[in-house]
Amino acid sequence: MAAENERKSPSAVSDMGAWAMNVISSVGIIMANKQLMSSSGFAFSFATTLTGFHFALTALVGMVSNATGFSASKHVPMWELIWFSIVANVSIAAMNFSLMLNSVGFYQISKLSMIPVVCVMEWILHSKRYSREVKISVVVVVVGVGICTVTDVKVNAKGFICACVAIFSSSLQQILIGSLQKKYSIGSFELLSKTAPIQAFSLLVVGPLVDYLLSGKFIMKYNMSSGCFLFILLSCGLAVFCNISQYLCIGRFSAVSFQVIGHMKTVCILTLGWLLFDSAMTFKNVAGMIVAIVGMVIYSWAMELEKQSIIAAKALNSVKHSLTEEEFELLKEGVETTQSKDVELGRTKD
């Protein structure tokens, strides 16, 4: 029992480390990008190209890691990597277009709807089923985050189509991260090292055009200052940790868990926005955050309950199996003893 606890402890610590890295880096990158892109900051309104910079630095880190032997490179078919990169890039572009064409309220609803979509897609693709407790906790989280983020909700045809594409592609991308790691027995960082160069190249080629359609500005005409350049470097550095931790979390847990616990970032962003940027914090925001946190706690409890039930089921099957073997051995010994006694009795009678 002590040996099992020793084995579980490092795993639990590394799990918490992956979550902490993702939350801290995600919140940090949003704060850096807010300063970078806002009109009160550097007005660098080229989100898709910036994402290309993010993946370029991530690809460079992966290449250095492979060259120094820090990580091993495993084979993944090129068509799988290209397919994944297409899905991931469509997700990025569609999210940006959705934000541009829809109201902030509808954009937040579309992001929240990713949780049930991921659940349905995992059920269709991997025949995965969820307990009643998990379903309830997911609903509580969605309602809580919805209360504190959704304001005005306006829908138009183009925006609705972009939102649907964004939801589908983002959900599929997160499922693919986990399935590719399992399918090819490849680590999260190794997979990221293979997909990042493809994403970086394609986003840096297509990104300026997408950004022009979104903002009406060309990146080549932007007047780059030293402060803006430093914030781009900061954003890219945080993106490396954000990308690595995303792959780590989905590889260790599931796309649904990543979505649910990931909404802790929304709570952190609202709180930091209130502390650092004088954003308004209303009773509605606070109430929504409390409901969301309660939902996350219920989800953690429900997942632990599922794990315990799986372990108990395996233990029961193991006990049943061992009892059957013991009974067979006892029965066998009993038959042999009876036969020997019969032989002895036969000899006595003679």
Curated annotation (Swiss-Prot):
The keyword Transmembrane helix applies. Its main location: Golgi. The chain crosses the membrane at residues 12-32, 41-61, 81-101, 104-124, 133-153, 160-180, 200-220, 224-244, 257-277, 286-306. SUPFAM superfamilies: Multidrug resistance efflux transporter EmrE. GO terms for molecular function: antiporter activity; transmembrane transporter activity. It comes from the Eukaryota. It is a multi-pass membrane protein. It is found in: Golgi apparatus membrane. InterPro entries: Sugar_P_trans_dom, TPT_transporter. Keywords: Antiport, Golgi apparatus, Membrane, Sugar transport, Transmembrane, Transmembrane helix, Transport. Coiled coil: none annotated. The keyword Transmembrane helix applies. One of its GO terms (cellular component) is Golgi apparatus. Disulfide bonds: none annotated. Belongs to the TPT transporter family. TPT (TC 2.A.7.9) subfamily. Nucleotide-sugar transporter that transports UDP-rhamnose or UDP-galactose and UMP in a strict counter-exchange mode. This is UDP-rhamnose/UDP-galactose transporter 3. It comes from Arabidopsis thaliana (Mouse-ear cress). The lineage of its organism: Eukaryota, Viridiplantae, Streptophyta, Embryophyta, Tracheophyta.
